[in-house]
Structure formats: C-alpha cells, structure tokens
Amino acid sequence: MSPNTGESNAAVYASSTQLARALYGGDLVSWIKHTHPGISLELQLDVPVKLIKPGMSQTRPVTVVRAPMGSGKTTALLEWLQHALKADISVLVVSCRRSFTQTLIQRFNDAGLSGFVTYLTSETYIMGFKRLIVQLESLHRVSSEAIDSYDVLILDEVMSVIGQLYSPTMRRLSAVDSLLYRLLNRCSQIIAMDATVNSQFIDLISGLRGDENIHTIVCTYAGVGFSGRTCTILRDMGIDTLVRVIKRSPEHEDVRTIHQLRGTFFDELALRLQCGHNICIFSSTLSFSELVAQFCAIFTDSILILNSTRPLCNVNEWKHFRVLVYTTVVTVGLSFDMAHFHSMFAYIKPMSYGPDMVSVYQSLGRVRLLLLNEVLMYVDGSRTRCGPLFSPMLLNFTIANKFQWFPTHTQITNKLCCAFRQRCANAFTRSNTHLFSRFKYKHLFERCSLWSLADSINILQTLLASNQILVVLDGMGPITDVSPVQFCAFIHDLRHSANAVASCMRSLRQDNDSCLTDFGPSGFMADNITAFMEKYLMESINTEEQIKVFKALACPIEQPRLVNTAILGACIRIPEALEAFDVFQKIYTHYASGWFPVLDKTGEFSIATITTAPNLTTHWELFRRCAYIAKTLKWNPSTEGCVTQVLDTDINTLFNQHGDSLAQLIFEVMRCNVTDAKIILNRPVWRTTGFLDGCHNQCFRPIPTKHEYNIALFRLIWEQLFGARVTKSTQTFPGSTRVKNLKKKDLETLLDSINVDRSACRTYRQLYNLLMSHRHSFSQQRYKITAPAWARHVYFQAHQMHLAPHAEAMLQLALSELSPGSWPRINGAVNFESL
C-alpha cells in the first residue's frame, strides 16, 4: 500500500477522516479480509498476546503481530523463543534503540535464553554471532555470511525499526536498507510486532513472501493500566501559577494557597503535589522538563529528571522518587510496571524539530500503571503554523463516527490529502532504496503534521484510542461526544492560550540560564572549540561573543542553521559549487560533519554531533536556488547589525520564478508541507482551513494575494534554514541607519540611488532637504532580513577572507581532494584529466 507503488488502498490517502487511522493500523482487519484473504488472520480479543508454538500445523514462516502497548507482546516472544531455540538455531534481533537493545538482552537473560550477544558488547567491528541483537544503524556491521544464514529474524517494534531509516543518525542508509530488505526476503522465520503495524507493512511482506506464508495476529487487549486510563487535554497551562511559584511573589509566599485554583496544568499539578501524590511528568522538550522540575522542587526534593543532559538510571530506581520528569529519552524498551505513581502530566509541544506524535505516544506508555488512572495533558501550539502556507489535512475520525463533518470541510481536506500524496510521490525519487522509498509517505506525514496543531492532536488521539485510552477535552467531555464545531473551538482556545504564554515561557527560560563569567575549557574540549572556530568563524570574534555562540548552539535548531549559513556562504564564494554536484558535495560534507561544542545553561561544555543528510542531490538543488536569491538580494548575514533591507517586489519576482520548485525542495529537506498557492488562495479553502486549525480570525480576513504568499514563503525558508527573521521595514529610507543619524555620505548615496541631481547641494542641510523632497521615491514596501547574532561571526563572503584565513585554508584543503574532472568546464576550458 505504498503511495508510489500503485497501492490497492489508494482511497485511504484521499480521506481526511480515514488517513491517520489507516497509517497506524486501525483498519488492518477489514483491509486484510478485503485485500489479502489468503493471509491467515487471528483475532485475539481482550486477552494478552499468544504466539503459535513452533512446529504446530498453523505455523507459517512470517508472523506479524499488531497489539497495543501493555498487551504482552515481548512476553509472548520470550515464551516462543523458549520453545523454538534449539542448539543449532540462529537468531537475529533488530532493535530500534540502544536502550531497547539493553532491555531486550536483560529480559532474554532473565528468561534463560542463552547465547545472545549485543552489538554494544562486541569486541569486533564486523559481527557474525549466531545469536545477535543489533540496532538498525549497525546492521551493516553484520557479516554477509551471517546475514544470509540466520534462521529467525525478530523485529520487535517493527514500525519504529523502519522509522529509524529516516533518522539523522542513519549514516549508511543504502547499505542498511538493502540488508534489512534482504533479511525480510530470505529469512526462514520472521516475527514482526508493533502497536501500529499497518497495511503498508503487510503489503510489503505479502509481496516478498506471499499471502500463504503469513500469519497475522491482531490483539485488542490493552491491559488494565491503559484501558481504564483517561487523558484530559487541558485548555490552559496556568502560566501565572508557574511564575508565582518559581519567583515566589509576595501574594503567593505560601504555596499552599494554590489549592484554591483549579483547571490549569500547573494548578492541578500543584494540587496533587500538595496532597502528597507521586507524579510522573512527560515533557516533549528539554527546556520544559527543567522548568517543571524547578516548579516541583518548591513542593518536594524527591525528584528524578531524565533528559538528554542527565544520566539515565535503572527503571527500578524510579520507585524511590515522588516526582519523575522525563523526555523522549525514555521510550520503547523501558517500562515501569509498579503501582507507584498516582497521576501523569504531559506537556507536548509540536514543532518541526521536535519528536513526532508516535514518539510522544510511545513515551507516554512507559509508566504502565497509574493509581488514579489519569493523564493531564497540555498541548502547546505556539510553534505550529496557520495560513497562508499551512493547512490541516485531517478530520478527527472519532468525531466523524458520531457526527458528520460539513461536506465543505471534507471536500477541502480530502483535496489537501491528495495534494500531499502527490508531493510525497515526487519526493526522494533518486533514492536507490527499497524500504526508505516505500515507507516515505508515513515518515513525511508524521513530520509535516507537526506544523499543524489540529493534525498533531488528531494523530495523538488516534494513537491513544488504539490503546483504549479515553481522550477528554477540558470543559467539553469525552471526545466521542464532541461535535465538529466544539472541537474546532477547542483547538482555537488551545492556540490562543499557547500564543498568550509563549513570550512568558521564553522569559522564564532565559531567567533560568546561568550568567557565565568563566570561560576556560581545557584538554579535549579546548581542542574541539579551537577546531570549530577555525572551521566556521572569523578570527575577530572575542571571548564574550564566543560564549554567546556556544550558548546559542545549545538549542538544537540553531546547529543546522549555522551549518547552512556556512554552506551558503561557500556556495556564493565558490560559484562552481552551483554548477557541479561533486564540488557542492565536498563543501557540504566539509561543513556538515564533525562536532559542535555547545554550552548549556549550567556552564558545562558538551559535544553535539553534526549529522549529514542522505539526500544531497535535493540539498544541492535547494542551495543553488538559495544562493541565487541571496546574491540577487545582496543578503550578507555577517554585515554589521546582521540586517539587510530588500524590496518586496524583488522577493516577489524571485519567488514567482522559483516558488513552486522551492516548495517541493523544502518538503524533502525541511519536512515542511507548504499548501500550494493555487489551493489555499481561494475563499472556501482559506476560511475552512483557518476554522479547522483554530485560526478563527483567518475566516474574516481577506484572502492573501500571491504577492503576500511569496513573502510568507521567503520568510519561512530564510527563518528555518538560516535563522533569519524577515519583517516589514518601518524606516523611511533603506539601510539600518535612522534618518536623524544619516551622515552626509549616506545622503549622497541615497540621492544617487534614485538618480537625483545633487550638484547644487554643498551642505548637509541642503542634501537633507533635497532627500526629504524626494522621499516619495522610497515609499515602496521594504523588508528587513535580520540574521541571528551568531551569524555576524560566520565566514560568509570572499572579502572576509583575511579575517578567516584558517576557515578558508581548511575549505581549500578539502576541495583539493577533488579530481580535476569534478570541476565544471565552462567557456571552453580544457579538460586536463583527458590529456
């Protein structure tokens, strides 16, 4: 059922109500019966998963299990292995996470399954162990002889394993993709399990192995820890309570007075902490995990924080803490089964560089039992977008079951789904892969939906419902009883709440940062800092500015932006990179490899690995266009003040030429699905998408013009790729200098730019009066492009070469590795390689 392989279930991809449910296997039973009746289908209703014992007559070579979290999938697997493992049986287990690998080997050992080795403990790089647990990224380390000889292939969390193909840490995509495909095609016995196994995976296996060789188990048992759980999505975070408690304002010296407040995330959290409850808190962002821990510390010092900056601890230690705060570092493979925590709180912030909703869903399921069976969730939509570029694609399936969405809503969202499907079909077309190409739709869907608040909530609710968790909308009741109008009103309230608290949250995070006065890294870290500065920065940067750069790089989104800025500058300095892919590839790998030193809020240095994208051809096409735009607009982020002013007509002209191709390119590179101008720029679509995504004021605003659409697209690309802000200029004249600060030379330059004769003017006053009499010539709308503060220190333009001799020398050294034939031959130049 792949969108690029003539799927048999094509109608699902055009259905805004069915799409999410189908992608996560909600329609698997009916789909198999209708499309693949030859597949053996077993329904296990309200009982834990049970696998057919090896050797029984019903056994088939491939077993696929779809079952919710907490249904006993891994336990059933262990029992199966205990019966299957004879002395001569070889087994390969492919894991999706390092933590999952460690959990599996522990459970295998506890179950008495001997002989298993993990890639983590292997003393050799190439592995040929008879029984091996390996993470997908390391699959290329398994010897070719071993790959072809394994008797049993186990893919626990199979959809997560396939999802790892799209991870930025996947460095050998083609090799790993080919090996996994080979295993699926040849291994004599396969067990694949996941809570979200879908028809797309079944279709793949059917094509490889044949329907007659597949047994599919669909289990509905979710366990009492999930089936009795209620998840309430709150309308308000309660930012006032957070500020009062953290800053200890006089009116709240005694935090016990908070018990009078109810209904918001922090009010409810404070109430339960005051009552002595044990609370687990999931946060989809690192910064909020630290902030909420600071809030909880007012009530108790028994707090465990698990995030990317802190060491993990054994899951059995969790019971010793009143409060557990964790991020997506706690995911599949880690489960806490004790009845210790009363309630769970969840803060979820959909954003382009954050975890997708499947990762959030998996992390929410790590605590298996809650004494009060309640999850209180706040979804922060401050980083999601509305029109004119973004439109929600999904209509909630649960609501559609009881109420009818308006026909206009259905028709428009179905059209958007079709447009998305077509864009997916055109993506990664040069990727020489089997699985990566086949499952790209699901990956792109999960990443692109993070730009939409409504889509993110719809996907999360679909996943929670598959685990029999009832979702309740604050003030409205169970989502099963909510009408379409009520649901859209709730999305509107959430968006309004998030926008209201965004600046306050930003201020709190900044206050939480330490003021660094000491800067003296030594040893290994000092060497890394020196290497980074010589590679990317100009030598004129002082120590204070260095600290600011390293602190900025602690934010994950700023790291690729700095790399992109350096690459763009190199492409402008070396125009051959825009003509020859090999030259661009060398520039790209030079800057997009290695490490970044980052400075966290505690003043500690750490290393962040720079990841290289697999689809460099797409990156080349994108940077070719961005370089042309930057040169045309004369954009230089390293100018004084990091500000460039451009005419809106210039932006519009450029994006009339390149807008369509840029939309497809950023779809692949940035995982950003921009709604086509031909679709969004008409009244029914404009009003409907605004209503569905909670932007109700959009319903009453005029439809944007193509000109405004182009400006918005430019703003998006420059912000996401380079961290630049594009805003309307309010200055009378071009440039960063205010009118009262203009010097005589500035006045002359401005008059010359509009071809005004100034020969009769001798004094400053005369020039000023002449300029003001012609100020109508500067009335055209201009935009300011403000680069981030760190950008002024990045080596960007050729005239800065003397300020960055090391950076230039390092790049030239990398380029010297290219053969003469890699450089473009233009204007009749001789091909010396052929002589």
Swiss-Prot record:
Top-rank taxon: Viruses
GO molecular function: ATP binding; ATP hydrolysis activity; DNA replication origin binding
Gene Ontology CC entries for this record: host cell nucleus
Gene3D superfamilies in the cross-refs: P-loop containing nucleotide triphosphate hydrolases (3.40.50.300)
GO biological process: DNA replication
Limits of the Helicase ATP-binding domain: 54-215
Keyword field: ATP-binding, DNA replication, DNA-binding, Host nucleus, Nucleotide-binding
Annotated positions binding ATP: A67, P68, M69, G70, S71, G72, K73, T74
Entry function: Functions as a docking protein to recruit essential components of the viral replication machinery to viral DNA origins. In the presence of the major DNA-binding protein, opens dsDNA leading to a conformational change in the origin that facilitates DNA unwinding and subsequent replication.
Name of the protein: Replication origin-binding protein
Organism: Varicella-zoster virus (strain Oka vaccine)
